């Protein structure tokens, strides 16, 4: 796992792209709990997402799970690959399985997220 990633309590990850945008996906732990992903509902380009609000849906053979925005901002890119290959979320949760890229409204929101070590400790306690 990339140690520069930040995480939420609800198992989303955020990668700071260093240009005012972030990439968002779901963690290895989340995809393991979901099982085989069969469908991903992607938000619209230019949609405004708000920290703590649902912006996407991931359906697996076991369940459908809302994906919550870790930060507030504007969707600048969606991972179209997931339309044809939703299994990328299982196979490469931190690489090919990313969901959206977002232009941050407030970069300080990143400070509210857990670092990789804190996140790993929290899931070990579950």
Swiss-Prot record:
GO terms for biological process: glycine decarboxylation via glycine cleavage system. Its cofactor is (R)-lipoate. Keywords: Lipoyl. Binds 1 lipoyl cofactor covalently. HAMAP family: GcvH (MF_00272). The glycine cleavage system catalyzes the degradation of glycine. The H protein shuttles the methylamine group of glycine from the P protein to the T protein. PANTHER family: GLYCINE CLEAVAGE SYSTEM H PROTEIN, GLYCINE CLEAVAGE SYSTEM H PROTEIN-RELATED. The glycine cleavage system is composed of four proteins: P, T, L and H. Belongs to the GcvH family. This is Glycine cleavage system H protein. The gene is gcvH.
